[in-house]
Amino acid sequence: MLHTFTTFFSPFSAKMMYFCSLIINAMSVKKLRFAIFGNIYQAKKSVSIQKILSFLYERKAEVCIDSEFYTFLTDGLHIDVKVDRVFEGDDFEADYVISMGGDGTFLKAASRVGTKCIPIMGVNMGRLGFLADVGPSEIEHALLAVYAGQYKIEEHVAIMVETQGVSQLAGCPFALNDIAVLKRDNASMITIRTSINGEHLVNYQADGLIVSTPTGSTAYSLSNGGPIIAPQAGVLCLSPVAPHSLNVRPIVVPDDAVVRLCVESRNHNFLVAVDGRSEKCAEGTTLTIRKAPYPVKIIKRNTHKYFHTLREKMMWGADTR
């Protein structure tokens, strides 16, 4: 009879026991604090945000929400959002951050977290979702895992930019993906005098130059022919945008390298894009790009495997015929 009993439950017993352990562990932990960011252009997220808020409310979590996202939910989607606090900018404290949107929303959340080093969980409401990899149907299970402590935290390198000379950047100088120097206002190329650790590398004549982290290697850099770099590799990649010479190729340098850029432009200005946040700079401004003094902490499920995600997102091996 014992053998029959074991056989009857074996197909699903392991999965059920694991799920039950998440629930039991989640019920015994302290009150947690969550900060929520979201994309304000995706109405389809209304069901997901209600699911998250209900889950956290049942567990008496302390919840604060970004003011722009709060206004979108209450005024735009007419959702009754009950939270402990609405905040602006980086004026918040939390144990965990939840980013609802795509990778762009995740990058925005990471810039707001900054030196707080709060772990971020990305809920993917966008398209590709390398960073925001929790699907809407997986939200409850992912939150249960957080409460049960059954998750891992990946520390991703961030980079920062400093300016010397004519222009100063007004926005956040830190990037998780990339910092790009780009031409502005006309079709003429710009010249980017580039040095690594004080040693001259090359004068790029191109539409721009992307300095990317391993995390950003699957973003803008990839579309310009840059290599895919595993997240924990300690390197940065310099990828020229539409270079004049075909001999100029992307180059990988150690992530403790100091990259210095000085730009010449026919219309005497250019753009600096920090994770897509663009600002105008005047010719004569020197940019210094280096590794940030803190990592970005990303919550991943224990079952997460980078190369599996990469293969799925890139559709490697998929027959699209």
Where are these regions (language model features)?
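Short glycine/serine/threonine-rich phosphate/pyrophosphate-binding segments
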Residues: 45, 104-109, 218-223
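Gly/Ser-rich helix-loop-strand patches that form or flank binding pockets
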Residues: 113-123, 130
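ATP/nucleoside-binding phosphotransfer catalytic cores, i.e., glycine-rich phosphate-binding loops
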Residues: 181, 197-200, 246-321
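Catalytic core of DAGKc-family lipid kinases
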Residues: 127-207
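Short, positively charged and aromatic/hydrophobic N-terminal segments
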Residues: 3, 7, 11, 15-25
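Short glycine-rich anion-binding loops that position phosphate/pyrophosphate groups of nucleotides
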Residues: 41, 103-105, 128, 215-217
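Gly/Ser/Thr-rich active-site loops/lids in small-molecule metabolic enzymes
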Residues: 203-247
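ATP/NTP phosphate-donor binding region
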Residues: 18, 26-96, 137-152, 163-173
